[in-house]
C-alpha cells in the first residue's frame, strides 16, 4: 500500500492488525455499529490468565483483539506468553482474537520461527522489542519476510534499549516501501516533539510539531502509529491542544491499542 488510506482500509489491505482473509467482514466495520479492534494485547500478561483477559476485553467493549507474543522465553522484555500461547488462545476463541508472530530479532532461528507461525495464520510480526538497532540487518531480514507474506511489523522503540536509532528508521521505510511498520512505545511517542530529549521516556509539557515520529507519519505511507500503553496516552495528555491537531493530521495513520495488564478493563490502571 503506497498511498495513505483510512484505518479500515489499512486493516483490510495489509493485515495491520487483522487480515481481511482472517476475519468476517463485520470485523472491518461493515455493520451499522462499528466494532472496536484492539491492536495491542498479550497473553499471560503479568500473570493474567486467558479467562480474565477475555473478560477484560469485553469490559472495554473490544470485539477483536490482536495478541502479540513474546517469542522464546525471556524475549520481549515483558512477562507474557509466546507464539504457542497466542496461537492456542486464537484457536480456542476464533471470534475474539487474531495473533502476530514474533521472535528475538538476532536469534539464529528468528526467521524460521516467525515464518512457522505466519504459515499457521499469524497476521503480522511483533511486537519487536529486542536489543538491536532499528536499521540493523536483523530488522531488515524481518522486513523481507514481512514483505513476502504481506504483513505489518510492530516496532517498540525505546532509546538505549530496544530498536535503537529511530533517527535512521527512514532508511528502512525507504528500502521496504511495501511493508507497513507500526511505531510504538516511549521513544516513538516522545519523538512527536521536535525538541524531544531521547533519554526522557515520558516527557511533559508543550509539544513542538515536526519531531521524528511526526515526520515519519507525514512523509512515509508505510508508517503507522500504535496508540497503546502509557506512552501513547502521555503523548496526548501532555499537550492537549497539540493532540487535537496531531490526531487530525494523522487520523488515518493511528491505531487503537490498550497494552494494559490490569484485571478489570476499566479505571486508572487500564
PLM regions with names:
Residues 1-18:
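N-terminal secretory signal peptides and thylakoid transit peptides that target proteins
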Residues 4, 47-51, 80-83, 107-111, ...:
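Structural motif corresponding to alpha-helix initiation and N-cap regions
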Residues 10-11, 28-85:
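An N-terminally biased module of ancient metal coordination in phosphate/nucleic-acid-related enzymes
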Residues 22-24:
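N-terminal signal peptide c-region/cleavage motif recognized by signal peptidases
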Residues 37-39, 66-69, 100-102, 126, ...:
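Active-site neighborhood of phospho(di)ester-bond hydrolases with catalytic His/Asp-centered motifs
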Residues 46, 258-261:
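Beta-strand-enriched cores of mature, soluble protein domains
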Residues 72-73, 79-164, 224, 229:
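Active-site gating/metal-coordination segments in enzymes
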Residues 123-124, 136-256, 263-267:
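Catalytic pocket-lining loop regions of alpha/beta-barrel enzymes
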Amino acid at each position: 500500500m503506497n498511498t495513505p488510506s483510512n484505518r479500515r482500509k489499512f486493516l483490510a489491505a495489509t493485515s495491520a492488525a487483522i487480515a481481511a482473509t482472517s476475519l468476517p467482514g463485520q470485523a472491518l466495520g461493515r455493520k451499522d455499529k462499528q466494532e472496536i479492534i484492539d491492536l495491542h494485547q498479550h497473553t499471560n500478561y503479568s500473570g493474567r490468565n486467558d479467562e480474565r483477559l477475555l473478560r477484560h476485553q469485553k469490559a472495554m467493549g473490544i470485539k477483536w483483539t490482536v495478541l502479540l507474543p513474546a517469542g522464546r522465553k525471556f524475549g520481549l522484555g515483558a512477562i507474557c506468553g509466546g507464539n504457542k500461547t497466542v496461537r492456542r488462545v486464537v484457536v480456542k476463541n476464533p471470534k475474539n482474537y487474531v495473533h502476530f508472530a514474533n521472535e528475538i530479532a538476532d536469534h539464529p532461528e528468528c526467521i524460521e520461527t516467525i515464518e512457522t507461525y505466519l504459515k499457521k495464520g499469524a497476521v503480522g510480526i511483533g511486537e519487536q522489542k529486542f536489543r538491536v538497532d532499528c536499521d540493523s540487518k536483523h530488522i531488515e531480514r524481518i522486513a523481507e519476510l514481512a514483505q513476502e507474506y504481506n504483513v505489518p511489523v510492530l516496532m517498540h522503540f525505546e532509546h538505549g534499549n530496544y530498536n535503537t536509532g529511530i533517527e535512521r528508521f527512514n532508511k528502512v521505510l525507504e528500502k521496504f516501501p511495501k511493508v507497513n511498520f507500526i511505531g510504538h512505545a516511549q521513544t516513538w511517542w516522545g519523538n512527536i516533539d521536535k525538541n524531544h530529549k531521547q533519554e526522557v521516556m515520558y516527557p511533559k509539557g508543550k509539544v513542538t510539531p515536526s519531531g521524528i515520529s511526526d515526520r515519519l507519519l507525514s512523509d512515509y505511507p508505510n508508517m503507522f502509529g500504535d496508540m497503546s500503553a502509557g506512552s501513547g496516552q502521555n503523548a496526548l495528555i501532555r499537550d492537549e491542544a497539540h493532540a487535537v491537531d496531531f490526531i487530525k493530521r494523522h487520523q488515518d495513520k493511528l491505531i487503537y491499542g490498550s497494552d494494559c495488564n490490569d484485571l478489570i478493563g476499566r479505571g486508572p490502571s487500564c
